[in-house]
């Protein structure tokens, strides 16, 4: 939020759960065109007893950052925020819109992404910065919650 605001962008914090907002920030191009979503999550896998002492340290070793969420997915969210700020500052987004959505709770219930969808947010395309071992993925597994009722005789 502070990084984007420093670049004269207007990030918006949208409350999703108690004290846990999604961050949305949109840059408008100079003319109409497609809307691209840059999406990442701000939570991490919960700590457990088997973690190798890294936790939330943010330790830098041999020029690399080690710590919870460094690759999944704080690095991608930071890169997307920097890209959005650069496009805005240089005026290089000539058409369309680009929105950064940093959503909460991807690792447990996907509350942030669900809130974004239920709010009516729409885009023509999306880049999700999940780590993929440096391979471009054009699809990914997802989840769907269903409630079913069956009636009859067994």
Predicted regions and their residues:
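Fold-level recognition of mixed alpha/beta catalytic cores in primary-metabolism enzymes, strongest
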Residues: 65, 71, 75-154
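Acidic/His- and Gly-rich active-site-bordering loop/insert found
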Residues: 1-68, 89-94, 104
């Amino acid at each position: 939020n502070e990084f984007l605001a420093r670049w004269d962008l207007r990030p918006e914090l949208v409350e999703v759960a108690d004290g846990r907002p999604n961050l949305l920030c949109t840059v408008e191009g100079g003319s109409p065109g497609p809307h691209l979503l840059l999406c990442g999550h701000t939570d991490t896998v919960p700590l457990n007893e088997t973690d190798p002492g890294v936790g939330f340290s943010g330790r830098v070793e041999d020029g690399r950052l080690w710590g919870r969420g460094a690759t999944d997915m704080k690095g991608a969210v930071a890169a997307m925020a920097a890209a959005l700020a650069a496009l805005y500052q240089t005026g290089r987004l000539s058409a369309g819109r680009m929105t950064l959505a940093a959503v909460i709770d991807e690792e447990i219930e996907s509350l942030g992404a669900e809130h974004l969808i239920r709010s009516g947010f729409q885009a023509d395309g999306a880049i999700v910065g999940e780590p993929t071992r440096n391979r471009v993925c054009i699809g990914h597994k997802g989840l769907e919650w269903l409630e079913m009722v069956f009636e009859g005789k067994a």
